[in-house]
Amino acid sequence: MTPLIADEVHVESPEAAVAPPSVRLDPDLLSDIKRFGAADVSACFSCGNCTAICPLSDGDGTFPRRMIRYAQLGMKDALISSKELWSCYHCGTCSDSCPTQADPAGFMAAARRYAIASYDRTRLARTLSTRAVLGTIIALALAAFFALFMYASHGVERASRLALFDFIPERLIHLTGVVVMSLVALAALVGVASMVAGIARREGVRFRDVLGGPGAWGRSLRALWLALGIEALGQRRYRNDCGEAAEAEPLYRRRWLIHALTLWGFLGLFLATILDYGLALIGVKATGTPVPIWYPVRLLGTVAGAAMVYGATLLIWNRLRRANVTASQSQFSDWLLLALVWVTGVTGFAIEVALYLPHPPTWGYWVFLVHVAVAIELVLLLPFTKLAHAIYRPVALFFHALAGTRTAESN
């Protein structure tokens, strides 16, 4: 058995494995994280088995062992400022091999929910993660509010063609979207600023290390490419290192692919929406006008929507049948995100079908109303649900890649 190692708390010897005097401790940290779905990791005696078996753990990322020690010691700032917290893809290998069944994988997932709530100043993320009943009420109330808000300004339902933006004015949707996106951007910026400040302080990264000259620019651009292009979008380590246990699964059911299709689909739909509005602004086509399926923006939206619905459907199915560690540990916030993503995608396809039918169905107007309300809610809740991973994980991966780049240059 390995003793409590020094690098867990950055001290010199196992006997000194306590937090430095200058570190502020939170004695309620571990019990608070349990409210976000963590198991009782007090059973963990730091044997190091989880770190040894984790395919992603390396000299600069001794997780989940280090994260668990932070929680046990009450080192909140160290925990939520750890880039390693976001490097984990929750494959469950560590929990399968834990000799005390402390469930380190479940702890890491709960710690990420806790970190999202800690970055959020509104406490909405905490409510959605820890209070299922109230969270359900909030989600339903938001959807109802946006639906009623849109319906209050609805126009005529035309029988000759499906004129969606005569039913709900396009300008109203656009202005509502701008307001919602502004609020989301503000919440995301506050959260990311808090995260970046904490990680930079822990990693000893200063402004000049990132943007202080040609050498720093080169390192930062390389780290950005590794974080966004290779890991966040390409999911290289998730696909190559974390997928070994799932090799028996056919490709279309592998977790990395399901996760990637859901992410790529969401981003593709977001891009298609922006392009559609952009083309409308420059007079190329009116928003919502039926066009051939091979029209570039329409094709992008169709392919992206199919990918998102496919990924979300399999994620829901895996959770219903508790197919893996991640599925068996789903919390309300996970279900809420999947429900919003799935409804947005399915209603979007229903609208597309209705637009191309020879005789426009009146149900298309009501599906459109639901689609708009849920889509706006999905975007509004982005910084407060598991979808916030799309914001915070790339930031953590950037610092992880930057540390690797700096280490390589120093050797």
Across the structure, where does each feature detected by a protein language model lie?
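Alpha-helix initiation and N-capping motif
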Residues: 26, 64, 104-108, 226, ...
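Short hydrophobic/aromatic segments of transmembrane alpha-helices and their interfaces
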Residues: 34, 61, 79, 90, ...
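Hydrophobic cores of alpha-helical transmembrane segments in multi-pass integral membrane proteins
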Residues: 136-151, 178-195, 258-281, 294-321, ...
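Juxtamembrane helix-loop transition segments at the membrane interface in multi-pass membrane proteins
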Residues: 202, 318-325
